[in-house]
A protein has these predicted regions:
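Hinge/lid segment of periplasmic solute-binding proteins
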Residues: 52-56, 127-183, 235, 326-328, ...
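Extracytoplasmic/periplasmic solute-binding protein
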Residues: 54, 164-177, 182, 207-259, ...
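Extracytoplasmic/periplasmic substrate-binding proteins
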Residues: 81-83, 87, 128, 232, ...
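Extracytoplasmic "Venus flytrap"/periplasmic binding protein-like
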Residues: 85-158, 189-201, 298, 306, ...
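C-terminal capping/gating helix-and-loop segments adjacent to ligand/active sites or protein-protein/ligand interfaces
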Residues: 99, 253-256, 341, 403-460
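Glycine-centered hinge/linker elements that transmit conformational signals in sensory
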Residues: 210-212, 255-287
Length: 467
C-alpha cells in the first residue's frame, strides 16, 4: 500500500502535534494580550487580508448581564457542561440553549442564521455555503486578537474557507470546542468470549472476529441508522474506504477539491465489504429505526461486541462500563499498512448578526485555554482540547478508555492518515445522500455501486447550488 502522508493530511488533524508538545512541555494557560476585534457582518468570503485591529481592549463578556443564544447537538453533554462552568466563572453570562439532532441542524441552520434572533453560538454541520452567503461571522479578527494564529496551524485549517469555496485555507469561520478521533470500541467481556486477545491487525482478522460473534449468538456490531440521527453506517464505510485506499482522495472530496469523486475503485471495494456485513447480519435488524442515543444505551447494556464511534463517547462509556470498554483503530486491509481514522473539530460558529459576538469569541478562547474547561473536555468528552501547543494535557483517570484514544491519536497523527468526515462534504450530503442511500442498502434496495453513484450525483448537485 502506498504511503499516505501528504500535506493535505496536515489539514485533518493537529492532535498528535499537540499531544507530543503537551507531553514534552509544561505551561500554564494565559489569556493572550489582544485588542478589540471588529464585528461587522461579512457579506462574502473575503478576498483581502483581515481587517486591522483597532482598539486596545481584549474582546470579552463585560460585566453587564448577557444571555448567550446557543444551539447545541443532542446527545453531546459536554458543550452544556462547558457552558455551565463558564457561567460559574463569569456569573453575568447566562445561556438560552436549544438542542437538536445533527440531521435536523443541517436543515435548520440556514433558517437559524438568517432569522430574527440569530444564535451567538451554533453547532455547525458544515460551513462553506453559510460563509459565502454572509451568514457566519468572519473570525479572522478574533484569531488575531486572541492569538489563535499562534496555535498549531492544522488546528484551525478545517474551519477555513477560501474565496473559491474550498475548505482548508482562507478566512476562519468556526472554532472547535475539541478535536475528535474515531475507531472501534469493544465490550471486553464479550470480546473475550469470542477469543479476542488483542485488537485485530488486519481487516481479515476483524472479519474473523465478526464471524465468531455471529456464530456465538452475539450481535457483532451495534450501530444506529435512523433518519433523525443520521445513518451511522457512514462510520464503518469510511473506515473501510481508508482500509482499502489512501486517505488523500477522501479528504479531497470532503474539501471539495476540483474533480474529486467518492466513486473510486477502492471505495467500491469498501462499499461492497459493508454490503457483505449487512447481508451477513452483523448489524441490528432494526438499525434503520435506531437513534444515536439508543444505540449507545444498548451497547453499554451489553448488546453488541463492537461499535464504531468517536472519543466523544469516552466519558459515557467509562461511566456505564467501567473497566469493560476498550478501543482500537480500524485495521488496514493490507498487513503492515498504517491504520487510519476520522478526526475533526467539534465545530461551532457565530452568526454574522449575533448580538454578543465578542462574548461568544471569548468563550471559544476560554474553552481552549482555561484549565477547568480543558479538563472537562478530556474527562467528560475524551477528546483533545486543542489550544496552544505549550499547554499541558489535563490528567486522565487511570484505566479510562481515553488513555487508549489519545494514544491512538498519536499513531494516526504520526502516520498522516487522518480524515475529516464524509458527512461534512457539503451542507446536506449526510441528510440527502449518505443517510437515505445507506438505509436503502440495509433494506436491500441499493447496492455498493449504486450507493456511490447516487451520493456523487447528490454531491455534484449540491456543489452547483452552493457555488
Amino acid at each position: 500500500m502506498s504511503s499516505r502522508k501528504s500535506l493535505g493530511i496536515a489539514v485533518a488533524l493537529f492532535v498528535v502535534v499537540s499531544i507530543v508538545a503537551s507531553a514534552c512541555q509544561a505551561g500554564t494557560p494565559t489569556r493572550a494580550p489582544a485588542t478589540a476585534v471588529p464585528t461587522a457582518v461579512p457579506t462574502a468570503v473575503p478576498t483581502a487580508a483581515p481587517t486591522e485591529i483597532q482598539a486596545p481592549t481584549i474582546p470579552n463578556c463585560g460585566t453587564e448581564p448577557i444571555v448567550l443564544n446557543a444551539y447545541f447537538e443532542t446527545g453531546f453533554p459536554v458543550p452544556k457542561q462547558l457552558a455551565e462552568e463558564f457561567s460559574r466563572q463569569f456569573p453575568n453570562v447566562k445561556w438560552d440553549i436549544k438542542e437538536d439532532q445533527f440531521t435536523n441542524l443541517i436543515n435548520a441552520t440556514p433558517r437559524l442564521l438568517s432569522g430574527d434572533n440569530p444564535p451567538d453560538l451554533i453547532r455547525l454541520p458544515t460551513m462553506v455555503s453559510f460563509a459565502k452567503e454572509g451568514l457566519l461571522m468572519n473570525l479572522d479578527g478574533y484569531a488575531a486578537a486572541f492569538g489563535w494564529d499562534q496555535w498549531p496551524v492544522p488546528q484551525l485549517n478545517q474551519n477555513r474557507v477560501a474565496p473559491d469555496g474550498t475548505r482548508g485555507s482562507g478566512s476562519l469561520y468556526g472554532m472547535g470546542l475539541n478535536y475528535s478521533l474515531t475507531g472501534v470500541f469493544y465490550n471486553k467481556e464479550l470480546a473475550a468470549q469470542i477469543g479476542m486477545t488483542e485488537p485485530p491487525k488486519t481487516l481479515a482478522e476483524f472479519d474473523e472476529l465478526l464471524a465468531r460473534a455471529k456464530a456465538a449468538g452475539l450481535l457483532p456490531i451495534m450501530m444506529w441508522g435512523s433518519a433523525k440521527s443520521g445513518m451511522g453506517l457512514a462510520f464503518p464505510l469510511q473506515h473501510l474506504m481508508a482500509a482499502y485506499g489512501p486517505v488523500e482522495p477522501i479528504n479531497d472530496w470532503i474539501f471539495q477539491k476540483p474533480g474529486a469523486t467518492i466513486d473510486t475503485p477502492s471505495n467500491l471495494k469498501a462499499a461492497q465489504h459493508l454490503q457483505k456485513w449487512i447481508e451477513n447480519g452483523y448489524f441490528p435488524p432494526d438499525i434503520n429505526a435506531i437513534e444515536y442515543t439508543d444505540a449507545n444505551a444498548r451497547f453499554t447494556q451489553g448488546e453488541g461486541v463492537f461499535m464504531f464511534n468517536g472519543d466523544w463517547q469516552n466519558g459515557a462509556y467509562d461511566a456505564a462500563m467501567p473497566g469493560n470498554i476498550g478501543f482500537f483503530l480500524f485495521p488496514p486491509a493490507e498487513a503492515g499498512a498504517p491504520p487510519a481514522a476520522m478526526s475533526a473539530p467539534l465545530t461551532f460558529g457565530i452568526a454574522a448578526r449575533a448580538k454578543h459576538p465578542d462574548c461568544a469569541a471569548f468563550f471559544f478562547n476560554w474553552v481552549a485555554t482555561d484549565p477547568t474547561a480543558r479538563q472537562i473536555n478530556v474527562t467528560g468528552f475524551g477528546s483533545h482540547p486543542g489550544g496552544p501547543a505549550d499547554l499541558p494535557l489535563p490528567t486522565v483517570p487511570p484505566g479510562s478508555v481515553t488513555n487508549e484514544t489519545l494514544a491512538a491519536g498519536a499513531v494516526v497523527g504520526k502516520a498522516g492518515t487522518t480524515m475529516d468526515f464524509i458527512a461534512n462534504a457539503t451542507s446536506s450530503i449526510f441528510a440527502q445522500g449518505w443517510t437515505p442511500e445507506l438505509q436503502k442498502m440495509v433494506a436491500g434496495q441499493q447496492d455498493a455501486a449504486g450507493l456511490l453513484k447516487a451520493v456523487q450525483a447528490e454531491y455534484e448537485r449540491e456543489l452547483v447550488m452552493e457555488r
